[in-house]
């Protein structure tokens, strides 16, 4: 697992942003339309296993067809940002090269290789925070790319890292923008795990002492999938935030299909229900039913769930009565609804916050969230000292 150590280039005289050619070099990196040389490499599959899978898939055509359907379904519906589109890629490139490199924030683009996937990523921070050990890992929604979050939607990253006193690691899923490989559910989870390892790696990674995972919409689901089989580092503090995330993808999708067909067609309820049942079954059959509830309930770390509610300001929720449709997700299809409806209640280190913002609106009260994050980190330190 090695390529280049980046840790010693984050602060001091050797810091990448203190070099006289920082702007020229970074601008050159941003202009590249292909991945940069790999900074961090993790191989999770043995070569023999990978070869056997490839041969098996080739021999048995139904498996190859199934994999093709899995990818195409993702490109069209689950992760449309991965659907090949030359015009969108031009826009993303324009967003990337237009980053203001003279601002207080410093940027470094890099590549993380996970088996055969090369993931395009970027670290963002300030000279005053790069050595504080706190990092936020952002996972995007299904139509987004990291280029938007450093461009037109910069407040979605800059706001949190400012209020969280954190640095950021942002990335694109497989198949999105410059990241290689097709969108594949297990690989997306695997990528999230490797990025989490990269953050905590003291030798070749970023040596994070505190990690905030911030997943929006699909990103919350990917976060949960990645953490399902991930062993958290007991030397690192964690807080995971899921913003406007679904309970499971089949429920969320069928609710959206039903709402759309009810508004746009004159079909009978029974016909619409039949189509919804088919859609739900298809999502499950082709293995795209990302389930956020189970991963959230099993998570061994503090967690904050943000969900649209009938509130004027941010508010802790203890029941689901104030949850409302957020413009994309029906209230009934949200992770918050599922957790608040659980007779066992929430975990002791889990909270749900009702917010007035709709699904894709920027968060308006980051100080409120930052306060909860600080409390959770403080509680973890007390627990670690006592154990």
Segments predicted by a language model, with ranges:
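The feature captures the conserved acid-bearing segment of alpha/beta-hydrolase catalytic domains
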Residues: 250-251, 261-344, 360
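Catalytic active-site module of serine/aspartate enzymes centered on a nucleophile-bearing elbow/loop
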Residues: 362-387
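Active-site nucleophile loop of the alpha/beta-hydrolase fold
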Residues: 173, 241-252
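Short, surface-exposed "cap/lid" segments of acyl-processing enzymes
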Residues: 115-163, 173-178
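Non-Sec secretion/translocation targeting segments of pathogen effectors
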Residues: 1-63, 77-97, 384-387
């Amino acid at each position: 697992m090695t390529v280049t150590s980046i840790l010693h280039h984050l602060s001091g005289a050797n810091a990448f942003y203190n070099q006289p050619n920082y702007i020229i070099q970074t601008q050159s990196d941003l202009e590249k339309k292909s991945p940069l040389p790999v900074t961090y490499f993790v191989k999770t599959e043995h070569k023999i296993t990978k070869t056997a899978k490839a041969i098996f898939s080739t021999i048995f055509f139904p498996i190859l067809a199934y994999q093709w359907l899995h990818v195409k379904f993702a490109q069209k519906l689950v992760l449309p940002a991965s659907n090949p589109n030359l015009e969108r890629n031009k826009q993303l490139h324009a967003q990337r090269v237009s980053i203001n490199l003279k601002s207080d924030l410093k940027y470094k683009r890099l590549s993380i290789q996970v088996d055969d996937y090369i993931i395009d990523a970027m670290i963002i921070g300030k000279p005053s925070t790069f050595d504080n050990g706190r990092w936020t890992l952002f996972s995007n929604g299904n139509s987004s790319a990291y280029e938007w979050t450093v461009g037109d939607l910069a407040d979605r990253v800059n706001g949190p890292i400012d209020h969280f006193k954190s640095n950021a690691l942002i990335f694109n899923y497989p198949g999105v923008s410059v990241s290689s490989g097709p969108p594949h559910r297990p690989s997306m989870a695997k990528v999230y795990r490797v990025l989490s390892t990269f953050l905590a790696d003291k030798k070749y990674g970023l040596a994070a002492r505190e990690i905030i995972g911030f997943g929006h919409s699909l990103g919350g689901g990917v976060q949960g999938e990645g953490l399902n089989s991930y062993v958290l580092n007991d030397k690192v503090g964690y807080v995971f935030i899921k913003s406007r995330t679904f309970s499971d993808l089949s429920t969320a999708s069928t609710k959206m299909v039903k709402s759309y067909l009810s508004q746009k067609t004159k079909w009978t309820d029974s016909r619409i229900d039949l189509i919804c049942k088919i859609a739900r079954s298809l999502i499950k059959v082709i293995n795209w039913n990302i389930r956020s509830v189970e991963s959230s309930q099993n998570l061994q770390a503090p967690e904050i769930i943000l969900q649209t509610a009938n509130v004027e300001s941010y508010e802790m929720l203890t029941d689901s009565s104030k949850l409302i449709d957020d413009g994309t997700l029906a209230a009934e299809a949200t992770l918050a609804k599922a957790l608040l409806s659980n007779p066992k209640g929430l975990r002791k280190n889990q909270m749900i916050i009702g917010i007035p913002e709709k699904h894709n609106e920027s968060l308006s009260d980051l100080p409120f969230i930052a306060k909860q994050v600080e409390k959770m980190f403080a509680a973890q330190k007390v627990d670690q000292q006592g154990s």
